């Protein structure tokens, strides 16, 4: 009932939710004659582990869909081992360091997780994953094995790092390195898969900073949002170099008297996350295939919406905050084009600026960072130039010009969805008016 009320109070979001549910046709389907029962089981596991992420993966082009599904499940298996405190220490380290070697086997599974571990099915049913993994092209297998090895060793290193376990992340550099192992490596692997599939220019992988920023922007947003939940669970990922400028201890921000200091710290962390936005937009401009673009764009627009939500928001210090379901539907539909993504970023950057107080210690730095992003977005399209002034053909302008051809191909689809929605709405309103007319006749 609460979600329905939310939608009713936000008609644009209600329209987006209805269009997403009833008018949009997925680009691709997972169900065809060649889908094996093992692969279908992998899709079931994917749905069990992450409903939202599963929905985006299922609509990927068939060339990428299966390998991205397996890549996600394999990394989820690693996460499940790392997070389970019931696994004996030495066994856990051994499993993490050598997990990539399990991918060479045709049969292997693990049932050593505690019974209440959420995603243990990924490990108990790992043989289904292995069967499908060995059907992938060798170049896809190689990428997944390499990233699995790097991530597994990174996880093991953090478990063995006594300073990290006692004191958490110390410097901003430590923060970036941690986010690299958790999310940057995923961006590395996915970018290589996309380039191998020829769904983006090869230059996309030549600039490490671009795909690194794709992962770091998402991870840093989640870390800021999850402050309260992580502290309750006995974890902390905010870097001391930043939070120690505002309080002696990280948990001090929960105290009412330190709330404003906590907000200043949140805003400082948002400033740090915003440093990745230009790279994110540059990366998105380099993707050609539509389903791959949507797969990459949706998490990024959700991240900027979440950053705007957590900015200067005291609720972050005391509980969980989430963007509305209706907002999610709206963002999914609008982010299907690069221009739509740019408009989303522009909207939420203005939202952040509107909540920025002059008293904020980072007032000037935040304004400068947001202005840099806004100038970059203007450079991407240059469609506000005076008459007879030619655009400056910068690398990003030319890249966006090429991407715009693919955006234009989506226009008929969007128009058809709008037509379907308007037709259905007209029919519903006509029926309701008809019933109302009959009702008034009987009353008379």
Swiss-Prot record:
Membrane topology (UniProt): Single-pass membrane protein
A molecular function GO annotation: squalene synthase [NAD(P)H] activity
Induction of the gene: Expression is increased in mutants with phenotypes consistent with known sterol biosynthetic mutations (ERG3, ERG7, ERG24). Heme mutants increase ERG9 expression while anaerobic conditions decrease expression. Additionally, the heme activator protein transcription factors HAP1 and HAP2/3/4, the yeast activator protein transcription factor yAP-1, and the phospholipid transcription factor complex INO2/4 regulate ERG9 expression.
Phenotype reported upon loss of the gene: Impairs the production of ergosterol and leads to a 6-fold increase in the synthesis of polyprenols.
Transmembrane segments: 421-441
GO cellular component: endoplasmic reticulum; endoplasmic reticulum membrane; membrane; mitochondrial outer membrane; mitochondrion
Pfam families (UniProt xref): SQS_PSY (PF00494)
Origin superkingdom: Eukaryota
Alphabetized UniProt keyword annotations: Endoplasmic reticulum, Isoprene biosynthesis, Lipid biosynthesis, Lipid metabolism, Magnesium, Membrane, Microsome, Multifunctional enzyme, NADP, Steroid biosynthesis, Steroid metabolism, Sterol biosynthesis, Sterol metabolism, Transferase, Transmembrane, Transmembrane helix
Pathway assigned to this chain's UniProt record: Terpene metabolism; lanosterol biosynthesis; lanosterol from farnesyl diphosphate: step 1/3
GO biological process, one term: farnesyl diphosphate metabolic process
Main location: endoplasmic reticulum
Function: Squalene synthase; part of the third module of ergosterol biosynthesis pathway that includes the late steps of the pathway. ERG9 produces squalene from 2 farnesyl pyrophosphate moieties. The third module or late pathway involves the ergosterol synthesis itself through consecutive reactions that mainly occur in the endoplasmic reticulum (ER) membrane. Firstly, the squalene synthase ERG9 catalyzes the condensation of 2 farnesyl pyrophosphate moieties to form squalene, which is the precursor of all steroids.
Name of the protein in its database record: Squalene synthase ERG9
């Amino acid at each position: 009932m609460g979600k329905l009320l939310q939608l009713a109070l936000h008609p644009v979001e209600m329209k987006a939710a209805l269009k997403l549910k009833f008018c949009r046709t997925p680009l691709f389907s997972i169900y065809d004659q060649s889908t094996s029962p093992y692969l279908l089981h992998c899709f079931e596991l994917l749905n069990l582990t992450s409903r939202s992420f599963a929905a985006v993966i299922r609509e990927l082009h068939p060339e990428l869909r299966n390998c991205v599904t397996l890549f996600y499940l394999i990394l989820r298996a690693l996460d499940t081992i790392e997070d389970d405190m019931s696994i004996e220490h030495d066994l856990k380290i051994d499993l993490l360091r050598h997990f990539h070697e399990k991918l060479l086997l045709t049969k292997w599974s693990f049932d050593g997780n505690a019974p209440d571990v959420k995603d243990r099915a990924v490990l108990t049913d790992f043989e289904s994953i292995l069967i499908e993994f060995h059907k992938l092209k060798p170049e896809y297998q190689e990428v997944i094995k390499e990233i699995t090895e790097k991530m597994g060793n990174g996880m093991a290193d953090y478990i063995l790092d006594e300073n990290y376990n006692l004191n958490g992340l110390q410097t901003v550099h430590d923060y970036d390195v941690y986010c690299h192992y958790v999310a940057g490596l995923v961006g590395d692997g996915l970018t290589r898969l996309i380039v191998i599939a020829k769904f983006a220019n090869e230059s996309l992988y030549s600039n490490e900073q671009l795909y690194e920023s794709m992962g770091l922007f998402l991870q840093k947003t989640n870390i800021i949002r999850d402050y309260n939940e992580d502290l309750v669970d006995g974890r902390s990922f905010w870097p001391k170099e930043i939070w120690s400028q505002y309080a002696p201890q990280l948990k001090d921000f929960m105290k009412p008297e330190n709330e404003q200091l906590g907000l200043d710290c949140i805003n400082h962390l948002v400033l740090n996350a915003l440093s990745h936005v230009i790279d994110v937009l540059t990366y998105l401009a380099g993707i050609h295939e539509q389903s791959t673009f949507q797969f990459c764009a949706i998490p990024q627009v959700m991240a900027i919406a979440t950053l705007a939500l957590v900015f200067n928001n005291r609720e972050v210090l005391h509980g969980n905050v989430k963007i509305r379901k209706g907002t999610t539907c709206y963002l999914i539909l609008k982010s299907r084009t690069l221009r739509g993504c740019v408009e989303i970023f522009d909207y939420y950057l203005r939202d952040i600026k509107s909540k920025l107080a002059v008293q904020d210690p980072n007032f000037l730095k935040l304004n400068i960072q947001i202005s840099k992003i806004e100038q970059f977005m203007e450079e991407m399209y240059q469609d506000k130039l005076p008459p007879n002034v030619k655009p400056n053909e910068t690398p990003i302008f030319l890249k966006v010009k090429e991407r715009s051809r693919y955006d234009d191909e989506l226009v008929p689809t969007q128009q058809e969805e709008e037509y379907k929605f308007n037709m259905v709405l007209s029919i519903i309103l006509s029926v309701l008016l008809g019933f109302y007319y009959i009702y008034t006749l009987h009353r008379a």
